[in-house]
Amino acid sequence: MILGTAKRNKEGAKPAPTRSYSSRQEKAVAKAVGGKVQKNSGATDFQKGDIVTSGMNSFLLECKTKTTPSASISIQKSWFDKNRQECLLTGTPHQAIVFNFGPDEENHYIIDEYLFLELLDHLNSLEENI
């Protein structure tokens, strides 16, 4: 490698910026949940989070992705604290952290215990009605 030049991948192209991986994940999640990707990844004063769904039981979603396939991801408490605070600011009743283990990998959703118990109760009531 010549000093002062960026390292190239095998095809000779520069690696994609981290933002492109995040954007791809956000668009896929928004499509899956029927939500809207927030402008500038929620960095504005009025639009918070990465994705917001609509309705009385709306969600504010914070997306986290790895830029290369990985067997693990480090979950940060600060992600939850920030998302919870943004829910309060926007009046959004529910929050979730969405993560994957690399580009084009399956997305996983982290919710709090209260919401999990609500989901479990709902699923059990559906089962009883069968």
Language model segments and positions:
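Catalytic phosphate/metal-binding cores of nucleic-acid and nucleotide-processing enzymes, i.e., regions
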Residues: M1-I130
